[in-house]
Amino acid sequence: EHITILNRDGEDVNTRFHQNVSGTVGYMTAYLDPIDQPPTAISYFPKDTEVSKTGEVYYYLTRRPFEKEKHIRHNLVCVGGPEEALPESKNYQRTSAFPKEHEGEINAFIDKTYEQSPNDGMKADYRWHGLMGYTSNGIRMVGPEPCNPNLLYNLGCNGIGILPSIYGGKRIAKWLSGKKPAPSIFDPRDYRCELPT
């Protein structure tokens, strides 16, 4: 969202919203199922779906145990996919309603794809939307800002982000504890600070 960084040590950090990530609003629904299937996380790239403003179209499904009532377990099936690009000049509205259009898109995807979907369709138990960030190259950024190593990044959703977030958190914890992790594809790069002076 909107932040201010006072930098007394290193190059100025560009705080524009889209410097390292592009903002989108992602829409998800969740359904309670019997706990008779294992946990899963799957991405789908339907061939018959129009390309979105973000340049890709995919749906994602996660299934995991969930305890709604005490000592009564269900599978929580979460499905997302529809997105709307968030221009830099526009603020994300947390309280805006869940669009019927996106609910219909998710329901159509579930009816066509999810084998456990009942014949009369699945009724959503939960609906929500949230701000998501995508890096320009599709690869998560984890580690110190090259021009100002006091700023640590763990940026980029780029699909199902649960496991990469955990991995990123572990790398950040190593940096904070004084250990320098081995170089990886996730290291932030900024050629301004890598050129010889």
List each model region and its residues:
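Extended catalytic-interface subdomain
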Residues: 1, 7-8, 28-29, 42-64, ...
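Central helical "cap/lid" subdomain
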Residues: 1-40
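Short loop/turn segments at secondary-structure transitions that flank enzyme active sites
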Residues: 3, 35, 67, 85, ...
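Short, solvent-exposed loop/turn segments at the edges of secondary structure
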Residues: 22-24, 54-56, 72, 137
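Short, solvent-exposed loop/turn segments that connect beta-strands within catalytic domains
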Residues: 37, 66-74
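Short beta-strand micro-motifs enriched in acidic
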Residues: 62-66, 144-145
